[in-house]
Amino acid sequence: SYDFRALLDDTRALSQNSDLAILNQETILGGSELGVSGYPAFNSPQEVGDAEVDAGYNTILSATNHALDRGEGAIRKDISYWKEKHPDVTLLGLHEDEADAEKIRVVEKNGIRIAILNYTYGTNGIAEPEDYLVDDLTEEKAMRELDRAEENADFTIVCPHWGTEYQLEESEYQRKYAKLFTEHGADLILGAHPHVIQPIEWVE
């Protein structure tokens, strides 16, 4: 078995003392039974998730370009793992059926209802066997879900998997969607994917 807890020691103090601790899980947690694999088609041991929960993370972003690296079966194993082993964790970006995909995730912290949305720009050219499996970033979907979040929450966080890897400046694509998000009620945008820190902006 694996033990990844030490890898999160440097952030543990922050994540364990936060009401909302959000982590971008870049690779699918399909587990060792499927065969652990690295680049370019990742599959990680589920002990990664155990370490994340031990470190205090309670919100997992799984809509990434690597979501379909090992197919639908790996996604279903990932979803089952979180539901069965850590049911209190909010899993975003992956869905087991259409009904689940229609739900907006809203968590309540200190009396504040927070909607969290997670999307990916794509899945590395791998076609989705079912449209509902991974939350893809489209204008129509984002606008529809942001409007629903506005109705059901006090604060909305959008977590897009977007941009260009290793670029220190945001792209026009990111700017376009950031404008759309804010115009439709997003209060905070937390992006992932470039693997570097990009600029932070306040929007009035």
Per-region residue spans from a language model:
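Acidic, metal/ion-coordinating pockets
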Residues: 1-204
